[in-house]
Amino acid sequence: FNPVGVAFKGNNGKYLSRIHRSGIDYTEFAKDNTD
């Protein structure tokens, strides 16, 4: 897992789960979430 992935898991498990289902990269999701 990337540092971002771990951070998401620690903050909210839904983010990590959604990434797996959507197949979105951790970095991409991080950018979208930050926006």
Swiss-Prot record:
GO cellular component terms, alphabetically, are: extracellular region; nematocyst
The entry's note on the tissues where this protein occurs is: Expressed in tentacles.
Q: Which organism is it from?
A: Heliofungia actiniformis (Mushroom coral)
Q: Which keywords, in A-to-Z order, does the entry hold?
A: Nematocyst, Secreted
What is the name listed in the Swiss-Prot or TrEMBL entry for this protein?
Answer: Peptide Hact-3
Q: List the disulfide bonds.
A: none
Localization in the cell: Nematocyst; Secreted
Organismal lineage: Eukaryota, Metazoa, Cnidaria, Anthozoa, Hexacorallia
Briefly state the protein's biological role. Answer: Peptide with unknown function. Does not exhibit antimicrobial activity against Escherichia coli and Staphylococcus aureus.
